[in-house]
C-alpha cells in the first residue's frame, strides 16, 4: 500500500516537474521577442479635436478614433465597479491572469456547450489591455501564451489603477466611441461623473459585443446584458438589493447632445479644419491631438445666415416654376414602392411623397411612413402661372417633394441654383457666419472661398473710390451717353451699354453710382486711368493680377465672395486693412494655448472643456496700415448709403437702418451679388449656378440676392440700434442739387467734400458737420465713437 502511494507521489512529482519544465521552457522561448510593454507608461492616446463657436457651442468633432481621455482619478467608483463585476471579478487580487477564473470558465463552458448557451471567456482586464495595446487579434496558441506572459509582467510593474486607466480609455464601445468618456457622451450626453448605476452598467456591458449591443435594434438583448452586470454588482457587494432593483427597473434611454449645445456649420467647420491643418503642418496632429479650437463663429448669426440663404435660393428657384415630378410609381403597394426610391440629395427638412389622387382643388398624397395628407391648390400656385386645376399639374403615382406647413403640405422642389453668404466684423476680421452652399452633404464646394466669379457692378465701388482718391469731386458731372473705347493696336473697340440699354444724359458722379450706370462708370474710369484702378483692385485684395482692360471696371475680373466681402469690410471700418479669419484660439489636450490670433494678454483665454462659455475679447486691434485715406473712404461710404436710399439697393430701406451697400450683376446675369454693411457688420451674398449660365433675363442682384440680405438683417439686427457712419475731420458736408451738383441753400442731397479741395466752393452753403444730424441719415458727428 505504501509502495503504491509512494509510486503515485513520485509520478505526481515527476509530472509537476515536467509541467514546470515545460512552462519554464515556454516562458523562456516566448520571452525573447515580446513587444515592448514599457511603452504603456508613455500612453498618449489619440483624442478628439473639437471646434467651438465663440459662444461655446460645439460645431464639429474630428478624430481617427473618437476618444476623450479621462484620468482614472476622475472615473467614479460605480463605473469602475461595473467593469470589475462585468469583466474581471478578481482583478484586484490576481497577478494579471486569473487561474481560478480559467478553471471555472472551463467547467462552466462544458455545461454551456451541452445546453447551447453562450461560452464564457476567462480573459482578465489586464489581458485585454495587452491584447488591445501590444498584440493582434490573431487566434493562436502562441499569441495567447504571449498574452499571459506579458499580463503577468505588467501586473508586477504597473498598479491596478494604471492598468484600469489604460483599459477604460482604450476600449471600443461602439458608435465610434473609444474610452468610457466618449461612450458616456455618445450614449447619454453626460460626463462619466454624471452616469447612474444603470448607465454605468450599460457601458460596462458593451465591450463584449459593441457592434451588436444596439438598443435601437435589439433592446431586449441589450437590457438583459445590462441587467446581468447590475446583478453581478449586487453579488459582488458593490450595491444593495434595493439599488439593484431600481437600476434593473429603469429603461435604457439614450440621449443625443442637446440641440442648444451645438450649431450646424459644415462649411465653416471645413474651412477651420483646412486652416488649422495648414497652421500645424500636420494632419496627424489635428486628428489625434485632442485640440480645442475656438472660432469667430456666432451661433445665432450662422443659423440665420443658413436659413436666409436657403429661403432665398428656394424662392428664386420657384420663380421658374415646377420642373417635373421625381418619378412615377404604381400605387398598388405605394409605401413599399416609395421606400425603394433613392432619397434625393439635399432633401433636408422636405419630405418625399406620392400623389394618390388629384382633384381640381387639391392633391391627396402618401408619405413614406404610411400617413396621408393633402396639398391645396393655393400651395401650388408658384408651380405654373394661372394654375386653375391640380389635374393639369400632377397625376396619380407622381413622386414629389413636399414641405409640412400648418395643417397641410406644400409642393416644393430642390433648387438647382446655388449660392453663399458670409458675415464679418469689419473691425476685427472675425468671420461671424459663413455658408458656402445650399447643402454641404451634397456639395462640399465652398462658394464663399473657392468659387471664382465675376462680381459685376460690385467692382464699380472701387472705380469710383479710385476717382475720389485722385481728387474727382462727388458732384462732378458725367454724361450717360454712348461711348466707344479704343483699346489699342490689334484690339477691337469696346462699346459698353447700360443694363436696360437707355441713356439718361448728364448726371453727377454720385447719381451715376447710385443708379449703377455702366456708361458713367466707364467715363469715370477713363478720367482716372486703368493703372490706378488696377492698383486699387490689388490694394483691396479683390484680385491679385487683374487684367488691365476696360471691361474690368464693369466687373469682368474674377474674385471670391470672401475677397470681395473683405474689400467692403475695409470700407466699413474706415479704410484700414483687415483680413477675414475663422480661428481665434487653439489649445492642446492639456489646455496649453498653442495659437491665439490676438496676442495681447487675456486673463480669460485659458478655456477648458468645462468652461467654454468664456467670451473671446472683441477689442479691435489698431492697424497702422491704411488701405485708403479716410476722406475718400467716407465719400465712397456716402455713395454706398445713397445706393440704398435711392439706388439699386432701395428695397433694403424697409429694414429701417442706416445701411451702405451695392448690388452686382455680371454679364448675361450669370452671377448676382449684394454686399451691405453697417458700422458693425458686413454681409456678402452671392447666387449663381455652379456651371455658370443665365439666371434669367431679368435676374439682378436687386431681385435675386438683396432679398437674402434683407431677410438675414431683419432677423439678426432687428433689435440693434441704427448707427450712423463717422464723419472724419477731413470732410465737410455741403448741400447740393442732386441733378446739377451745384450748391443751393436747400440742396436735395448732402454731399461729402474733402476739406483740402473745396476752396473754390461757395462757403455760404457749407454745413457744419455738427449741425447736420437733424435731417441727414447715415452721418456721424466726430464727437461720437463706433465700437
Swiss-Prot record:
One of its GO terms (cellular component) is plasma membrane. Signal peptide: none annotated. It holds the Pfam family Transpeptidase. Residues 1-6 are cytoplasmic. This is Penicillin-binding protein 1A. Residues 49-220 are annotated as: Transglycosylase. It is a single-pass type II membrane protein.
